[in-house]
UniProtKB/Swiss-Prot annotation:
Start and end residues of each stretch annotated as Disordered: 69-104, 253-310
Region feature (Activation loop): 677-701
Enzyme class at the top of the EC tree: transferase
Source species of the chain: Xenopus tropicalis (Western clawed frog)
Alphabetized GO MF terms: 1-phosphatidylinositol 4-kinase activity; ATP binding
Protein name: Phosphatidylinositol 4-kinase beta
CDD domains per record: PI4KB_NTD, PI4Kc_III_beta
EC number: 2.7.1.67
TM stretches of this protein: none
Main function: Phosphorylates phosphatidylinositol (PI) in the first committed step in the production of the second messenger inositol-1,4,5,-trisphosphate (PIP). May play an important role in the inner ear development.
Region (Catalytic loop) residue spans: 658-666
Biased composition range(s): Polar residues: 283-302
Keyword terms, alphabetized: ATP-binding, Endoplasmic reticulum, Kinase, Lipid metabolism, Membrane, Mitochondrion, Mitochondrion outer membrane, Nucleotide-binding, Transferase
Family per similarity comment: Belongs to the PI3/PI4-kinase family. Type III PI4K subfamily.
Length: 806
């Protein structure tokens, strides 16, 4: 308190008083001197200040701001509650009233507190109502998307807001919500009950509608609950919901399902015994019995299936079979033994197909009819045995209700062939289409061709499938056309030479078969050629709805980090597309089955840079020249641009997510020149053996720069420009990326979340406080540092010495 001065105040002569005033001129106290005694009287201004101090403390506790306090003080004088300033009422020293006692001041303080508390509560209620009104307008506007809904569901602490968001989920498209399914289920498992109660109705509703959604929920709930302690996990909400889903209680509202009549061709004359084929146990639960088929007549076109099938059992058994194969392969010592065992296991699996099973990674409804077992390959892995399979499916309208195709048995190939042994040569298109329900007689081994031995020949002799047969057939068509044409066609010699040279440049090279790396041959073969070849050898290939899918089965690996990386890549891809930045990345689908198993969507028409260098013994630039022609051709320039756009995109991904373990076995090169990074097992806070050896922002080798045209080339400058544009676009939408990672950190024990600074470091890598000029300098520094990084070279050398990765 500042200095004071004594100032006389008008009073009775017999009762002089002294008033102490502070620097502001306000009275501090009044001292009355009498005969033989000194009486202390509290001035109203002092009481006002004391009340104000109490109010400040109360409001501070209740979270009121100083601004609202000032507003209340200035507006409440008319109520007789408090005195805003010294001029609001007469001072006690100037009044004729008696002295104010201390007890009365205490009552006034309490009254002031009560009155102001009520007014403050009313004002807070008005403010909250205004905020809720604006929030409701936001929730109901067209710009409110799933990303914003997930953000408010995670950050809001108001049960009413959480419940509203839970209901709002029903308004979004299924595919938009499905993208955030890991976040929703992780919040359901690890956050409070209000969030779980808001999410559960939507999940239950979707599970009643879709078997595929039910299984994905069950798998994710099991995987994300595994981080909990066993005693807690057993009684957790996630475990209870998973049991509810797998108990098959969440069935559709209708109890019985009507089955459409089975159309029979009148001229087939097949007896019931001919039409009854061996089916799997899993399909037995969903297939239609022969007797029920015979009951469908013209007078009774529809017959209800009395026994409601077990909805989830067939698909679960199918997935378990694939996972069990991978576990058994891991016990074998050599790659050749693993490959032989894989082929025999898949051959046995084919005896249970077709069935009401499907690949969850596909984007359309279908039934699996066959697995060409000789085309399966074991992928490169030091300790485990991931394998790649191709799956023949028949597309259908609804895999839950559409009829399962009948089985067409495979038969052994003959060493000699004749016209008599080709029964399908005379089958018309209509007859082939009708064979969906009427199976031709394949009892005679001489009358059928098996894809098994054909596939073995193709694996042993891959050169036979990449010869010039297509060129010969095209040449024959061109010759016939030219012979039939009577008018001469003049073509410049230069155009002919250019077309021939570019055609040769587009002709893909082949890889030789390597017993230590059998996947190289399979992955190098063009996808369309593979589809054509497998379809020609398949007994189901003549169906118009035949499709070929592929999937990688992994056992012993936790794919939850892969799923997280996939979500971030998809979000970045969407951001760059919306901001019109021509960066290219290829996110591939991840299916988490459990905490140590899952499926991965393969990238077709792509091989690893390690396989390229090992098979061709060429530098990356020389391989580009071999595959796409000289550096002046249109094919090479297109491939070079694709390389630059994809390299810039993945460099930003590797920087933002801190992707490690970037050896050449984890970087693919596709037929169009793009690079694709795979294996995101080490991201954010984790690194191989937790050594943190790779210190560069991303991998940018001198070979990559050579493909771009060198340090002084236009394409290298284009690469740096794309890096800058991509980083600027990404930081504009930082929240959309960060929330994906932040929500998954809840309750997680994944290595990528070790340490308390994971999210903070991720946000810092977006450099929100930098100008665009500063970002440009940062990009230049990161590019220069990555090119000169000694740790990148040492890590590549370490991988070559330990694992033979070039």
């Amino acid at each position: 308190m500042g200095d004071t001065m004594v100032e006389p105040v008008p009073a009775k002569l017999s009762d002089p008083t002294l008033v102490l005033r502070g620097n502001g001129g306000s009275p501090l106290c009044v001292i009355t001197e009498g005969v033989g005694e000194a009486q202390m009287v509290i001035d109203p201004d002092v009481a006002e200040k004391a009340c104000q101090d109490v109010l400040d403390k109360v409001k501070l506790i209740r979270g009121s701001s100083a601004e609202s306090l000032d507003k209340i003080d200035g507006s409440d004088t008319g109520d007789g509650g408090s005195l805003a300033n010294g001029d609001a009422g007469p001072r006690h020293s100037e009044s004729c009233g008696p002295p104010v006692s201390a007890s009365r001041i205490t009552e006034e303080e309490e009254s002031l507190i009560d009155i102001n508390s009520v007014k403050s509560a009313r004002r807070r209620q008005k403010n909250n109502s205004a905020k809720q009104s604006w929030l409701l307008r936001l929730f109901e506007c067209k710009l409110f998307d799933v990303s914003m809904a997930i953000s408010y569901l995670y950050n809001s602490k108001e049960p009413g807001v959480q419940a509203y968001i839970g209901n709002r989920l029903f308004c979004f498209r299924y595919e938009d919500v499905d993208f955030y399914l890991p976040q929703l289920l992780n919040m359901y498992i690890h956050m409070d009950e209000d969030v779980g109660d808001a999410i559960k109705p939507y999940v239950v509703h979707r599970c009643r509608q879709s078997i595929n959604f039910s299984l994905q929920c069950a798998w994710l709930l099991g995987a994300y609950s595994s981080d909990m302690h066993i005693s807690t996990q057993r009684h957790s909400r996630g475990t209870k919901l998973r049991k509810l889903i797998l108990s098959d209680e969440l069935k559709p509202a209708h109890k019985k399902r009507e089955i459409p009549p089975l159309s029979l061709a009148p001229d087939t004359g097949l007896s019931p015994s001919k039409r009854t084929h061996q089916r799997s146990k899993s399909d037995a639960t969903v297939s239609i019995s022969l007797s029920s088929n015979l009951k469908r007549t013209s007078s009774n076109p529809k017959v209800e299936n009395d026994d409601e099938p077990v909805r989830l059992a067939p698909e679960r058994e199918f997935i378990k079979s694939l996972m069990a194969i991978g576990k058994r392969l891991a016990t074998l010592p050599t790659k050749e033994q693993k490959t032989q065992r894989l082929i025999s296991e898949l051959s046995l699996l084919n005896h249970k197909l077709p069935a009401r099973v499907w690949l969850p990674t596909a984007g359309f409804d279908h039934h699996v009819v066959r697995v060409p077992h000789t085309q399966a390959v074991v992928l490169n892995s030091k300790d485990k045995a991931p394998y790649l399979i191709y799956v023949e499916v028949l597309e259908c309208e609804n895999f839950e209700t559409s009829l399962v195709p009948v089985r067409i048995p495979e038969n052994r190939i003959r060493s000699t062939r004749s016209v008599e042994n080709l029964p399908e040569c005379g089958i018309t298109h209509e007859q082939r289409a009708s064979s969906f329900t009427t199976v031709p007689n394949y009892d005679n081994d001489d009358e059928a061709w098996s894809v098994d031995d054909i596939g073995e020949l193709q694996v042993e002799l891959p050169e036979l499938h990449t010869n010039s047969c297509d060129n010969i057939s095209q040449f024959s068509v061109d010759s016939i056309t030219s012979q039939e044409s009577k008018d001469p066609v003049f073509i410049a010699a230069g155009d002919i030479r250019r077309r021939l040279s570019e055609q040769l440049a587009h002709t893909p090279t082949t890889f030789r078969r390597d017993p230590e790396d059998p996947s190289a041959v399979a992955l190098k073969e063009p996808w369309q050629e593979k589809v054509r070849r497998i379809r020609e050898g398949s007994p189901y290939g003549h169906f118009p709805n035949w499709r070929l899918l592929s999937v990688i089965v992994k056992c012993g690996d936790d794919l939850r980090q892969e799923l997280l990386a996939y979500q971030v890549l998809k979000q970045l891809q969407s951001i760059w597309e919306s901001e019109r930045v021509p960066l290219w990345i290829r996110p591939y689908k991840i299916l988490v089955i459990s905490a140590d198993s899952g499926m991965i969507e393969p990238v077709v028409n792509a091989v690893s840079i390690h396989q390229v260098k090992k098979q061709s013994q060429l530098s990356l630039l020389d391989y580009f020249l071999q595959e796409h022609g000289s550096c002046t051709t249109e094919a090479f320039l297109t491939a070079q641009r694709n390389f630059v756009q994809s390299c810039a995109g993945y460099c930003l991904v590797c920087y933002l997510l801190q992707v490690k373990d970037r050896h050449n076995g984890n970087i693919l090169l596709d037929a169009e020149g793009h690079i694709i990074h795979i294996d995101f097992g080490f991201i954010l806070s984790s690194s191989p053996r937790n050594l943190g050896f790779e210190t560069s922002a991303f991998k940018l080798t001198s070979e990559f720069v050579d493909v771009m045209g060198g340090l002084n080339g236009d394409m290298f400058n284009y690469y740096k420009m794309l890096m800058l544009q991509g980083l600027i676009a990404a930081r504009k939408h930082m929240d959309r990326v960060v929330q994906i990672v932040e929500i998954m950190q809840q309750g997680s024990q994944l290595p990528c979340f070790h340490g308390s600074s994971t999210i903070r470091n991720l946000k810092e890598r977006f450099h929100m406080n930098m100008t665009e000029e500063q970002l440009q300098v940062l990009v230049e520094q990161m590019v220069d540092g990555s090119m000169r990084s000694i740790t990148t070279k040492l890590y590549d050398g370490f991988q070559y010495l330990t694992n033979g990765i070039m």
